[in-house]
Amino acid sequence: MLKPQDMLVTLELAAHEGEPWTYEALASELGMSASGVHAAVDRAGTCGLLNPKTRTPLRPALLEFLVHGVRYVFPAELGRRRRGMLTGASAVPLSQHLASTETSPLVWPYARGEARGESLTPLCETVPIAADRDPELYALLTLVDGIRVGGARVREVAAGVLTELLRR
């Protein structure tokens, strides 16, 4: 069974496919333990999101899961107004494709964040730290949040942008 950190690891591998990596380096980048990354890679391979032999993302399967399944497997949990990092429709790249609204922005709670808005619990607790270190991963994670929490239009646009990024 997939765990939220499996998505973080899989998205990191998708963001940097073709680049060499080790479990230790990936763990450091994502704020996880090496054994946690290893277990995440194994689970993602078992579920068909990564090739179990090459440990590379199976992009069509990953995209299908993100567009059609992630919001049901890892539902969004909204909270009170907090300081944090922008996500979902409030963050680039999704915000560039949608008309601005006057609603409160969505943020992952994060002490080093520069925005205030309605909090959205990230897929796992290390997401803001990892996203702060890696702009490509940040873009993918915010698009996934657009799918998890957005209305029909936001989900449609997020799926389109995610498809474009993952098909590169």
Task: Report the location of each language-model feature.
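Helix-turn-helix DNA-binding motif, specifically the short coil turn and the N-cap/start of the second
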Residues: 33
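Hydrophobic residues on short alpha-helical segments
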Residues: 7-14
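N-terminal, charged low-complexity regulatory/assembly segments
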Residues: 161-168
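Short acidic, hydrophobic short linear motifs in intrinsically disordered regions
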Residues: 18-30
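Basic amphipathic alpha-helical segments that dock to polyanions
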Residues: 26, 36-50
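Exposed, interaction-prone assembly regions rather than primary DNA-binding/catalytic cores
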Residues: 74-160
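Short, cationic-aromatic polyanion-contact patches
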Residues: 2-6, 19-22, 52-82
